[in-house]
C-alpha cells in the first residue's frame, strides 16, 4: 500500500536499550541465539550475539537510507565500546525504498532483494507482517524478515532439502546483560590467592571499567583482603592490539593500600588475574595516573607487565 513507500528503515530496525532478544533455532544447534545491545548511538548500535558456541559483536548503522553491518568480530567475550570501528568490508542488510523489487549486490557477489513488504510470518512470539529480504547465493538462499517496531523476527536458510531457521521467541525489556566474572583476592595467611565468581549486571551503555571497579569493591572471599580500596578508581581499561590489557588506576589505590612487600605482590597478582582473565589475556600493564606502577616496595619499568598466573589459586566463597 501507500504507507510502505514512505516506510523508513528505522521503523523496521529500532535501536533499543536494555533489551534482550531470544531467537529459537531449528535445524542446527547454533541457530538458537540471544541478542543484546551493549552500546547505542542515535543511528548505530553494537550488539552482542550469543549462540552458545561463540559471542559475536556486530555494529549496525542506519545511514543514508541503508541498514549496514559495518563491523563484525567473533570470540569477543568482554565488553568494549567498538562503535567507532569499521571493517573494510561492510554489508548492506536492508535498503530504502522499502519496496518489492529493490535489489542490490553484496561485496561477495550475492544478490539481496526485497521480495515482499507485507509477508505473513509466524514466530513463537506471535504473528507479524514483515519486510521480506531474500539473499541468493550459489547454492542456497537466506530469507530475513523485519517487522515494524520490532526488528528482525525470523531468518531462514534454505539449500536443497536443508532448512535452518531462527525465530524470535522472547523480548525481555529492562534487563541487563549478565556476565559471570572471577575476582581474585589475596590471603596473606596461607599465601594463596582465592577467587569468587560474581554476576555483574551491565545495562546498555554502561562503562565496563566503572562496573568492574564497583564489583571489585564488593565483599571479598572469606579471610582474604580487599584489592580495590574505597576510593580506588579505574581511569582507563582496554585490551590493546599487542594482546596486553592496559589498566590505569588513580592514586588512591596506592595511598590507601596498607601492605608489606609480599602482600602487595599478591594484590598485584590478584589484579593481573582478574583483568587478564576478563579479557582472556596473559599480560597486564598496570599504571597509576598514566605512569608506571611504583610503590615503596615494587617498581615496574616502562612497558613491564604483570603476568597472569593461576598457580596456587583456590575457588573461595
PLM region spans:
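Bimodal "functional hotspot" detector
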Residues: 1-3, 161-317
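Conserved functional acidic sites
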Residues: 3-178
Amino acid at each position: 500500500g501507500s504507507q510502505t513507500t514512505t516506510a523508513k528503515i528505522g521503523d523496521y530496525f529500532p535501536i533499543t536499550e536494555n533489551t534482550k532478544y531470544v531467537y529459537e533455532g531449528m535445524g542446527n544447534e547454533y541457530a538458537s541465539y540471544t541478542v543484546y545491545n551493549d552500546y547505542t548511538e542515535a543511528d548505530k548500535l553494537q550488539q552482542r550475539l550469543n549462540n552458545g558456541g561463540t559471542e559475536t559483536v556486530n555494529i549496525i548503522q542506519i545511514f543514508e537510507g541503508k541498514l549496514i553491518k559495518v563491523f563484525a568480530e567473533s570470540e569477543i567475550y568482554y565488553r568494549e565500546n567498538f562503535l567507532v570501528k569499521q571493517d573494510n568490508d561492510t554489508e548492506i542488510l536492508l535498503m530504502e525504498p522499502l519496496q518489492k523489487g529493490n535489489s542490490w549486490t553484496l561485496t561477495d557477489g550475492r544478490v539481496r532483494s526485497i521480495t515482499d513488504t507485507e509477508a505473513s510470518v509466524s514466530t513463537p512470539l506471535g504473528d507479524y507482517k514483515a519486510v521480506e529480504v531474500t539473499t541468493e547465493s550459489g547454492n542456497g538462499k537466506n530469507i530475513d524478515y523485519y517487522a515494524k517496531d520490532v526488528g528482525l523476527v525470523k531468518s531462514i536458510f534454505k539449500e536443497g532439502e536443508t532448512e535452518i531457521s531462527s525465530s524470535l521467541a522472547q523480548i525481555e525489556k529492562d534487563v541487563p546483560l549478565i556476565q559471570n566474572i572471577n575476582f581474585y583476592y589475596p590471603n596473606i595467611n596461607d599465601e594463596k590467592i582465592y577467587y569468587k565468581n560474581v554476576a555483574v549486571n551491565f545495562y546498555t551503555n554502561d562503562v565496563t571499567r566503572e562496573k568492574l571497579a564497583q564489583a571489585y569493591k564488593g565483599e571479598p572471599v572469606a579471610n582474604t583482603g580487599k584489592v580495590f580500596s574505597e576510593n580506588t578508581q579505574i581511569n582507563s581499561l582496554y585490551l590493546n592490539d599487542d594482546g596486553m590489557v592496559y589498566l590505569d588506576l588513580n592514586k588512591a589505590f596506592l595511598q590507601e593500600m596498607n601492605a608489606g612487600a609480599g602482600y602487595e605482590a599478591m594484590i598485584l597478582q590478584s589484579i593481573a588475574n582478574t583483568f587478564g582473565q576478563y579479557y582472556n589475556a596473559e599480560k597486564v600493564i598496570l599504571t597509576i595516573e598514566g605512569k608506571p606502577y611504583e610503590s615503596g616496595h615494587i617498581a615496574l619499568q616502562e612497558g613491564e607487565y604483570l603476568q597472569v598466573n593461576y598457580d596456587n589459586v583456590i575457588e573461595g566463597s
